[in-house]
């Protein structure tokens, strides 16, 4: 009897051990199969993501994919002059694209009010972009015509195009000729020439306004920024560009060469926030000075020099000197706070000292310098 019990127990142990081994082997097999399956799914997802990222703006519209858009521009790019967000040209375009193509556009802005091509180039190079953008709307020129020469405007505008193409060769760029020009000029001609060279179809809102049959004062309350009625023409003009390119299945990944020789000066971007001499400025995410005569000095061997600073309420003024020669005085006082870039020189040769010296401070105000941009 005892012998039978012992035999039965031994048999039971063997069975349990066998089952345990089978379970362990099966679990390992399942785990391995799950790992292989997970790897395959990851590869499929990566392949899908890669396939989608290889699609250009218009191909994504054809496939009803989501769109990432970047807006580079000034206050008109922001739709300043509207009474509500629904009147903003970009929101009208987003609504139209959603309705017509069943694609959702997500937008990110770079720069804003008072922007010139100089500031846009600096901000774009300084930005830490985490998305791959499918389309970019460039809305510049209004402020440039009062701040830089056409030959300077064209090299910064072209450098912006090249920078965007380097970020994504498939990116679609839609330049906007701003209605505030009122008539075509040397700055709008730059945009037209660059558009032709880089196979870009621009949105001509000068023509749209002039052919509208409406007085400019009807489409703009301050005779610069469009109002809600004016921005309707922006949206319609941009939508027409998009639709024409959609129907023609436009190719956006193109071979290109630099159009303007001066643009080659902007191949490199260097942001220098370490002055060689600091007399009185406090270091706080930049350099803050609040007394006349406080100064910063940067030594440079580069051809390009741009001062990057903060415009803000209770600002002040500073003078810029190159090798002790006065270049210009810059006013940093503004009704709102915004970073700004001012072109100081772009044809320097040899060694130079650039000195920034506070010349005036508004009561309880300050001047904030962010750095010197060179090439």
Regions found by a protein language model. Give the residues of each.
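Serine-esterase "nucleophile elbow" of acetyl-processing enzymes
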Residues: 40-109, 126-129, 306-309, 348, ...
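Ser/Thr/Pro/Gly-rich low-complexity linker/stalk segments immediately outside membranes or between
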Residues: 27-44
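Oxyanion-hole/transition-state-stabilizing segment in secreted/luminal serine hydrolases
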Residues: 119-154
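Cell-envelope and extracellular/periplasmic
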Residues: 110-115, 137-146, 178, 210
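Active-site segments of SGNH/GDSL-like serine hydrolases
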Residues: 161-193
């Amino acid at each position: 009897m005892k012998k039978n019990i012992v035999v039965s127990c031994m048999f039971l142990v063997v069975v349990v051990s066998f089952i345990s081994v089978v379970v362990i082997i099966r679990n390992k097999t399942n785990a391995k199969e799950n790992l292989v399956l997970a790897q395959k799914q990851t590869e499929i997802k990566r392949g899908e993501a890669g396939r989608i990222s290889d699609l250009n703006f218009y191909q994504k519209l054809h496939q009803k994919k989501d769109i990432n858009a970047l807006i580079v521009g000034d206050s008109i790019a922001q739709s300043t002059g509207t009474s509500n967000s629904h009147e903003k040209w970009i929101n009208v375009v987003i609504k139209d694209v959603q309705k017509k193509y069943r694609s959702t556009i997500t937008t990110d802005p770079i720069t804003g009010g008072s922007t010139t091509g100089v500031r846009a180039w600096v901000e774009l190079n300084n930005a830490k972009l985490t998305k791959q953008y499918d389309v970019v709307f460039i809305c510049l020129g209004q402020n440039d015509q009062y701040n830089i020469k056409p030959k300077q405007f064209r090299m910064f505008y072209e450098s912006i195009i090249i920078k965007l193409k380097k970020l994504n060769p498939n990116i679609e760029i839609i330049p906007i000729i701003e209605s505030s020009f009122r008539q075509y000029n040397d700055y709008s001609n730059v945009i037209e020439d660059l558009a032709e060279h880089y196979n870009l179809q621009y949105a001509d809102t000068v023509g749209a306004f002039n052919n509208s049959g409406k007085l400019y004062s009807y489409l703009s309350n301050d005779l610069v920024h469009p109002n809600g009625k004016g921005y309707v023409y922006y949206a319609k003009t941009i939508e027409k560009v998009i639709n024409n390119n959609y129907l023609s299945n436009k190719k956006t990944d193109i071979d290109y060469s630099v159009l303007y020789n001066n643009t080659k000066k902007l191949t490199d971007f260097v942001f220098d926030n370490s002055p060689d001499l600091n007399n009185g400025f406090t270091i706080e995410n930049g350099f803050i000075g609040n007394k006349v005569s406080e100064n910063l000095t940067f030594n440079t061997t580069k051809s390009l020099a741009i001062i990057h600073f903060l415009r803000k309420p209770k600002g002040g003024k500073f003078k810029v000197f190159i090798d002790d020669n006065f270049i210009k005085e810059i006013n940093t006082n503004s009704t709102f706070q915004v970073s700004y870039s001012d072109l100081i020189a772009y044809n320097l040769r040899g060694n130079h000292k650039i000195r920034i010296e506070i010349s005036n401070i508004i009561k309880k105000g300050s001047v904030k310098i962010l750095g010197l941009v060179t090439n």
